[in-house]
UniProtKB/Swiss-Prot annotation:
Region (Interaction with tRNA): 171-173
Keyword Ribosomal protein: no
Active-site residues per Swiss-Prot or TrEMBL entry: C125, C221
Name the record gives this protein: tRNA-specific 2-thiouridylase MnmA
Taxonomic source organism: Erythrobacter litoralis (strain HTCC2594)
An annotated Gene Ontology molecular function: tRNA binding
Length: 384
C-alpha cells in the first residue's frame, strides 16, 4: 500500500480540530459514514498527528426496510469506510445500531407521515444515534473530541462554543443540527465547515481515498429511491387507506386519494383533480378522517407557527432573529414570543407571510450565521 501523501491544507491540520493538548498526545474519534466528507475528516485527523479511531454505525438494512432482498446500501457504505480506514492505517470499529435507529428514527418517520405531518428524520438521527450514542462511544474510547463531516462551523464565543452556518451556503447543514446541546458542542468538531465541496474532493483525491468521486447522497438514507410512501405503507399498511380530496374553502369533494402518506403540505403534483379554475395545492391533511384538503396557493401563506420541544444553544442575543422552516430555504426575519430551550414551546411570527410551512418540520432560529436553536413546528396560523 502506498503511503498517504501530505495533504494540500489551507491551515495546519491540528488547528482544524482545536485540540485541548498537543496533537501527538491526543485521540480523535471520527464518525465515518462511508461518504467522501467523513472520509476526508478522517484523513485530516490522521494528518494532524493525533491518534485516530473511526466509528461507523450500521443503522439500517434497506432490503429489510422495503422488502427487497439483497439491497443493503448500508453494507456498501461500511465497506467504503473500512477501506478508507485501512488506507489511512487507523483503527475502525462498526457498531450495530439498527434496532435503536429503527425505533427512534424510522418508526417515528412512519408515524409522522401517518398523522399527516412532514417529518425530518435526519434531525432525529442527529439528536439520537449520531450524536448521543457516538459521543458516548467516543468518550468511552478516551477521545479528546468527536469529529464529523457535517458542513457547519464551531466558533469560539464569549460564552463558549457556538454553532454557525458553513461558509459555503450551498453545503450548509446547520438546519439539521439545531438540537445539538452545549455539552455536545463542546466535544464536537466540524473541520469541513470552512471548506467548499470542491476542496474536500481535492483532498480526498490527494489522500488516495477510493470514494473520492462517490456521489453525494440525495435522499433520506433509509429511503434511497425517494419513495417515502412505499416504506411507510410497508411499515404502516393503514397509510394506504383511500379517502376524499376536498376543497378547503367550499368543502366540495373533488376526488379520491390513495392514502394520505402520498401527500405533504404544499404539494401540487399527483392530485389528479383536473378541470379546476385555478391551480390547487395540498393545504392541510386530516389524518383522522383520511382527508386531503386542497386550495389555492394563497391558503399556504403562514403568519406564525407554534414550535414545541425547543432547544437553545447558548444565550439568546438581543439582536434581530431569522428562521428557516426547510433546509434549503433562506432564513427570513421573525419575532420570537415565549421561552426558547429546555423543551419549552415558543411562537415565531414571520415578518412576511411564509409559504410551505407544515407541522412536523423544524423551525430553526438564527442570529446572523449563528444557530440559536429551534424545535418542531406543531401548528401554524394562516396569513390568508
Amino acid at each position: 500500500m502506498n503511503a498517504v501523501a501530505p495533504l494540500p491544507l489551507p491551515a495546519d491540520a491540528a488547528d482544524m480540530f482545536d485540540l485541548p493538548r498537543p496533537a501527538a498526545e491526543s485521540r480523535i474519534v471520527v464518525a465515518m459514514s462511508g461518504g467522501v466528507d467523513s472520509s476526508v475528516v478522517a484523513a485530516l485527523a490522521h494528518a494532524s498527528g493525533a491518534e485516530v479511531i473511526g466509528i461507523t454505525l450500521q443503522l439500517y438494512d434497506y432490503g429489510a426496510a422495503t422488502g427487497r432482498k439483497g439491497a443493503c446500501c448500508a453494507g456498501d457504505d461500511i465497506q467504503d469506510a473500512r477501506a478508507v480506514a485501512d488506507r489511512l492505517g487507523i483503527a475502525h470499529y462498526v457498531f450495530d445500531h439498527e434496532s435503536a435507529f429503527r425505533e427512534d428514527v424510522v418508526e417515528q418517520f412512519a408515524d409522522d407521515y401517518l398523522s399527516g405531518r412532514t417529518p425530518v428524520p435526519c434531525i432525529r438521527c442527529n439528536m439520537g444515534p449520531k450524536f448521543t450514542d457516538l459521543l458516548r462511544m467516543a468518550r468511552e474510547l478516551g477521545a479528546d473530541c468527536l469529529a464529523t463531516g457535517h458542513y457547519v462551523r464551531r466558533v469560539a464565543g464569549e460564552h463558549g462554543p457556538e454553532l454557525h452556518r458553513a461558509l459555503d451556503p450551498a453545503r450548509d447543514q446547520s438546519y439539521f443540527l439545531y438540537g445539538t446541546t452545549e455539552t455536545q458542542l463542546d466535544f464536537l468538531r466540524f473541520p469541513l465547515g470552512d471548506l467548499p465541496k470542491t476542496a474536500v474532493r481535492e483532498l480526498a483525491e490527494a489522500a488516495g481515498l477510493r470514494n473520492a468521486a462517490k456521489p453525494d447522497s440525495q435522499d433520506i438514507c433509509f429511503v434511497p429511491d425517494g419513495d417515502y410512501a412505499k416504506i411507510v405503507k410497508t411499515m404502516r399498511p393503514e397509510g394506504g387507506t383511500p379517502g376524499d380530496i376536498v376543497h378547503a374553502q367550499t368543502g366540495e369533494v373533488l376526488g379520491q386519494h390513495k392514502g394520505i402518506v402520498h401527500y405533504t403540505v404544499g404539494q401540487r403534483r399527483g392530485l389528479e383533480i383536473g378541470g379546476q379554475p385555478e391551480p390547487l395545492y395540498v393545504v392541510g391533511l386530516d389524518a383522522a378522517a383520511s382527508r386531503v384538503k386542497v386550495g389555492p396557493k394563497r391558503l399556504l401563506a403562514v403568519q406564525a407557527a407554534s414550535v414545541i420541544e425547543t432547544n437553545r444553544i447558548g444565550p439568546l442575543p438581543d439582536v434581530p432573529l431569522t428562521a428557516k422552516v426547510r433546509s434549503l430555504a433562506k432564513p427570513v426575519p421573525i419575532t420570537l414570543d415565549g421561552s426558547l430551550g429546555d423543551g419549552a414551546t415558543t411562537r415565531i411570527t414571520f415578518e412576511q407571510p411564509e409559504f410551505g410551512v407544515a407541522p412536523g418540520q423544524a423551525g430553526v432560529i438564527y442570529a446572523g450565521d449563528r444557530v440559536i436553536g429551534g424545535g418542531w413546528i406543531d401548528s401554524t396560523e394562516s396569513a390568508a
